[in-house]
Amino acid sequence: MPLFNSILDTIGRTPIVRLQRMAPEHTSVYVKVESFNPGGSVKDRLALSVVLDAEAKGLLKPGDTIVECTSGNVGIALAMVAAARGYRFVAVMGDTYSVERRKLIRAYGGKLVLFPGHLGSKGGNLIADELAEKYGWFRARQFDNPANPSYHRETTASEILADFAGKRLDHFVTGFGTTGTLTGVGQMLRVARPEVRVVALEPSNAAMLARGEWSPHQIQGLAPNFVPGVLDRSVIDDLVTMDEVTARDTSRRLAAEEGIFAGISAGATVATALSIAEHAPEGTVLLAMLPDTGERYLSTFLFDGVDEGSDDAWLASLDTGSGL
C-alpha cells in the first residue's frame, strides 16, 4: 500500500464486486461500490474535479469560499475537498434531505443554508447564485460544469474499462442525477465498448427525462427538477423508471443478502439491473453504479419500520426452536 500525501489522493479506484445471491443464476450482475471513496460517495470525484479545474483557471485562491446547491452527497464531498485544500464551504440544501448529510457537512467544517424542499434543485440553485453574487463566493455549478463529466471520462470510465478488459459487459446501469457519471462514462463506452447498452434510470414520480414531469421523491440524489446542462442524451440506450419503494427494498436486500450497505439510489440501480437480468439471455453481464453508503440514510424511509430495540422475543424463541 503506498503512502499518500493527501486524503484526496485516495479518491477513485473503487472496487467492482459480483452479486452472489440476488442475481439470476444465468447472468452476472456486478456493482461498482463508490462508498469506498474517502467521503463515502461517487461525488468525491465531482468535487475534486471541480476544485482542481477552478484552481487551474485561477478562480480559487486559499481562503476562498465555495457555495453549491446540493442534495447532500456533493455537499459532503465539497466540504471534504475544501477542508483538505484550505477553502470554506457553504451548502445550500433542501430541508427534506437527511439529517445525516447536514451533520457530515458540518463535521468537515461546512456551513448550511436550508430551503423548503418543495422548491427543488431549481430553487436551491437560485439561492446559491444569489449568495455567490452577494458575497463573491465561487459557485461549483455541478449541473453545468464540464469538469464533472470530464473527470468521469478520465477516472470512472477508465477504471471500468480496465476492470472489464477482455471480459464481457452488456449493460451499464446508472441513475439520472447531475448526469456527470452517465455522460462521462457513457461517452467513453460509446468509443471503447460500443456493444455495451447504457441504461439511465429516474424515479417513476419524477421522470424529467422520460416525460418532463417532476414531483418530490424519496430517492435522494436522483432526479433534480430540471435537465442538467452537462447531460449528453445521445449516450442513453435505455431510459427506465423505478419506484422508490422497490429502490428502498432492494437497498435493504443488498445489505442483508450481499453484505453491501448502500443508499436508496443504489437500490434503484440494482433493482433496474436485476429487472433487466431476469429476462436477459444466458451469460449476460451487467454493471450497476452504487453511488453511496446507506449510513447517511439512517433517519430516512430506508429504515422505516426497522426495530431499534432489543430482540428479546427472538432470543426467547430460540428456547422453543421457533427462532431458528
From Swiss-Prot:
What UniProt keywords apply to this chain's record, in alphabetical order?
Answer: Amino-acid biosynthesis, Antibiotic biosynthesis, Cysteine biosynthesis, Pyridoxal phosphate, Transferase
InterPro entries found in the cross-reference section: Cys_synth, Cys_Synth/Cystath_Beta-Synth, CysK, P-phosphate_BS, TrpB-like_PALP, TrpB-like_PALP_sf
- Per UniProt, where does pyridoxal 5'-phosphate bind? N73, G177, T178, T179, G180, T181, S265
One GO MF term, please? cysteine synthase activity
The residues forming the signal peptide are none
Phenotype upon changing Y97F: KM for OAS is unchanged, KM for H(2)S is 0.073 mM
Question: Can you tell me which residues the record assigns to a coiled coil?
Answer: none
User: Which cofactor does this sequence's record say it needs?
Assistant: pyridoxal 5'-phosphate
Q: What is its EC number?
A: 2.6.99.3, 2.5.1.47
Q: Report the residues modified as N6-(pyridoxal phosphate)lysine.
A: K43
Q: Which GO terms describe its biological process?
A: antibiotic biosynthetic process; cysteine biosynthetic process from serine
PROSITE patterns linked to this entry: CYS_SYNTHASE
Catalytic reactions of this protein: hydroxyurea + O-acetyl-L-serine = O-ureido-L-serine + acetate + H(+); O-acetyl-L-serine + hydrogen sulfide = L-cysteine + acetate
**Assembly mode:** Homotetramer.
Please explain the role this protein plays, according to its UniProt record.
Answer: Involved in the biosynthesis of the antibiotic D-cycloserine (DCS), a cyclic structural analog of D-alanine, used as an antitubercular agent. Catalyzes the addition of hydroxyurea on O-acetyl-L-serine (OAS) to yield O-ureido-L-serine. It prefers sulfide as the second substrate, followed by hydroxyurea, L-homocysteine, and thiosulfate.
The protein in question is named O-ureido-L-serine synthase
